[in-house]
Design a protein with these regions (language model features):
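Conserved C-terminal alpha-helix-loop-beta "cap" of PLP-dependent enzymes
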Residues: 131-207
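Conserved PLP-enzyme active-site core in the AAT-like
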Residues: 1-130, 136
């Protein structure tokens, strides 16, 4: 649909990473990752990554900023980013942050494998043990997206699951009863985290 309207398909692959899902192979033109999450793995660096396929045909009338870099051919978009974004905002990763991310990448495969298997086992246990709780996890056969996830994700279904427990009061009672997880608004950490999004990261969002 995006390409019909001459719009690049941009994918935020932060929660899956390239370990679980390779967006460029599935038709995305641009893939972005908050590398502060799973890629880093220890919550000690703020950074992001952008990967461009080089395949998208930028319409010069719709994207005059890109057209100015047409001499760079398929890499005109990257040239535009490097020339304007770096120059105007200084968006260049600090060496120490890059170093911390590289350390995290060395264990990315191992961490994702373990976190995904743990999430699946927990989701299955919750679904079987507490039928009154709605467990949303793409690795469950009862999930509406299971067949698509099974087709597209070859190494696991991610490390995030959500629960619907009936009310905000029930949600906080559950969080307060937990002993191992930390109550923090982050993902991709080596620690197990739990949060009530409606009261934190989505507090100012509309329904």
């Amino acid at each position: 649909i995006a390409h019909v309207h001459k719009i690049p398909l941009i994918l935020d692959n932060t929660t899956a990473t390239a370990y679980l899902f390779q967006g460029l192979k599935h038709g995305a033109d641009i893939v972005v990752n908050s590398s502060s999450k799973y890629i880093n793995g220890s919550s000690n660096s703020i950074s992001g990554i952008l990967t461009y396929s080089g395949r998208f045909q930028w319409d010069p009338e719709m994207y005059p900023q890109i057209a100015a870099y047409k001499k760079f051919g398929p890499m005109a978009y990257i040239a535009r980013l490097r020339n304007s974004l770096f120059r105007d905002t200084g968006a260049c990763l600090a060496p120490m942050n890059a170093y911390l991310n590289l350390i995290g990448m060395e264990t990315l495969g191992l961490r994702m494998e373990r976190q995904c298997s743990n999430a699946l086992e927990l989701a299955q246990w919750l679904e079987e043990t507490y039928p009154s709780v709605t467990v949303n996890y793409p690795g469950l056969k009862s999930n509406n997206w299971y067949e698509i996830a099974k087709k597209q994700f070859s190494r696991g279904y991610g490390a995030i699951l959500t629960l619907r427990v009936g009310s905000k009061e029930n949600a906080f009672a559950l969080i307060d009863a937990l002993r191992i997880p930390y109550t923090l608004s982050n993902i991709g950490d080596t620690k197990t985290l739990v949060i009530h999004p409606g009261s934190t990261i989505s507090l100012h969002s509309s329904e």
